[in-house]
Amino acid sequence: MRGLFVTGTDTGVGKTEVACALVRAARAAGLDAVGMKPAQSGHVPGEPSDAERLREASDRVEPLEAICPYTFGAPLAPAAAARLEGREVSLARVVEAARALAARHAAVVVEGAGGLLVPLTARETHADLAAALGLPVLVVARAGLGTVNHTALTVEALERRGLAVAGIVLNRTGPEDDPSVPLNAAEIARLTYREPLALLPWEPDIARRARSLGSILGAKIQF
């Protein structure tokens, strides 16, 4: 399977933005890429869900249920949200859905939920999903204070499991003036032996930010 698995160091770090930007950049370059969200939970009515945003980035080439096999109401990890509804997530079903997309498209960008070790099923985490898919993992992290520890831990967890690290992207998720931002990339590189691929700037205009991310990431990340 050709593509990327996009994980984060936490929830709210910008995984969906990055995944959508990667899909758009790939499609603009002539590669038939499609996004996938294996399981989403806590969707706020009236706002586009992560899966809907990935479908839009993919030019609506697939129905929503093909892009997102599982949807839950509670804003919890997929395994916990499924339990509340008396349901269970199947790793085999998710892998089958991803392979079906890969059979119809040149590349699949799979966006996980939360961080790498967030439980996907009653027994498996998103790390297990990345391993089952055999995809390199792109780590999306906050640019500001606290990211050095979170990012180093995530990279260490990937390496201990023998998962390929496609790179690290630091994302400014707000306009706050954080003096740690200019220093964090160097610290992460020193600890992980991996220079972050990009430091994504904050941009309040959503459309402009989407174009900016696509331009930056399209030049940095190939799959």
UniProtKB/Swiss-Prot annotation:
Substrate binds at residue 41. The active site is at 37. InterPro entries: DTB_synth_BioD, P-loop_NTPase. Its cofactor is Mg(2+). It catalyses: (7R,8S)-7,8-diammoniononanoate + CO2 + ATP = (4R,5S)-dethiobiotin + ADP + phosphate + 3 H(+). Keywords: ATP-binding, Biotin biosynthesis, Cytoplasm, Ligase, Magnesium, Metal-binding, Nucleotide-binding. It comes from the Bacteria. Coiled coil: none annotated. SUPFAM superfamilies: P-loop containing nucleoside triphosphate hydrolases (SSF52540). Pathway: Cofactor biosynthesis; biotin biosynthesis; biotin from 7,8-diaminononanoate: step 1/2. Its EC number is 6.3.3.3. GO terms for biological process: biotin biosynthetic process. The keyword Transcription does not apply. One of its GO terms (cellular component) is cytosol. Mg(2+) binds at residues 16, 50, 111. It is found in: Cytoplasm. ATP binds at residues 50, 111-114, 171-172. The keyword Phosphoprotein does not apply. Pfam families: AAA_26. GO terms for molecular function: ATP binding; dethiobiotin synthase activity; magnesium ion binding. Homodimer. Belongs to the dethiobiotin synthetase family. Catalyzes a mechanistically unusual reaction, the ATP-dependent insertion of CO2 between the N7 and N8 nitrogen atoms of 7,8-diaminopelargonic acid (DAPA, also called 7,8-diammoniononanoate) to form a ureido ring. This is ATP-dependent dethiobiotin synthetase BioD.
